[in-house]
Amino acid sequence: MHTHKAKRVEITIEKIMQSRLSDALVKADVHGFTILPVYGGSGRSGLWDRTGQVGRAEGMVQFICIVREERLDALLTAAFKVVEKHIGVVNITDCEVLRAERF
């Protein structure tokens, strides 16, 4: 089966920023993404999980986007405008897809 090269972008950000990041991606013509809950992890401040959090933050979410390489800069530019001043991580990896017309 023939595969096609693409980029997988994972953006982990505070849940409170979910709608702003969704809107920014759609405005940048990135319509295909999945949003998953993040239950915990470890970072510069040590281990954390979402239990016992107080306030509006409600933990973290992760966006997963798969795009053609020529769409990557538009996605990153839109995402960075939202992510740059907040807690978050952006990860980019090479991947392959079966149906290139979907991306």
Show the residue positions of the predicted features.
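Positively charged, small/polar-rich N-terminal and surface patches that mediate targeting and assembly
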Residues: 1-103
